[in-house]
Amino acid sequence: LGAIPFVVPVRKGVTPSITTSCWGDSCILVPYAIYRSTGNREVLHQMYPVMKKYLADVSRWAMAGFIKNHSRYIFSLPFQFGDWCAPYGNPKDWLGKGPWTGTAYYCYACQVMSEIAEALGERADCDFYRKKSEKIKKAYRIRFMDGDGTLNEEFQTGYVLPLYFKMAGQKEAEKMADNLWKLIRENGGHLNTGFTATPYILFALADNGHLKEAYQLLMEDTNPSWLYQVKKGATTMWEQWDVIEENGQVKEASMNHYAYGA
């Protein structure tokens, strides 16, 4: 029906064929990145039917059980990776952030889909996805924020994604960026983000009045940080921030992964 499994090809009995944000959004974001790099619309033409089916499936899950109000735009089912492989907590904690990450990526996917539709001359679709993204933005703020740029439950990823995805007005975004930097300071000057937000955290800061602070975060070299991995001899990105721990012990995790901005 449009689900994009998070492992392809699907292995029966091993990999569930279910829709999940970020991983599934690759069917939209990767072709769009190719188009932006090459100017060639062919990949958009080829993938457009898949993109539409995917977003229709996301919409079905978001609306499951909800007919009215903002809840029908909150994407949390059937499964979300949430703040996957963040430095804090455990998998249960990461998965628990699924409603935030799922909804933010749902909004972003609709934004990008509107731009793709425009590039392909699909004006009705362009308008449809643009309007849907606006409704999702509103739903995110109603569900997760206090109306003044502060999350009801504060964590770095919850600010990074709506900042990078332009889900707030300028004044609100400035407050969100201030709050993000406050959380980073309170965490000893370290990021505290997983797969879904780390690629965007520097941009979320730099584009919203915190350029100097973004460079401070980039140059941090104690765990968790990018340069901590370099100090430990990494030449590729790890699956977790501290696959090699301070004491030299090595965890059972990938040391060549599609993670943290790689």
Question: Where do the protein language model's features map onto the residues?
Answer:
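Active-site core of glycosidic bond-cleaving carbohydrate-active enzymes
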Residues: 1-262
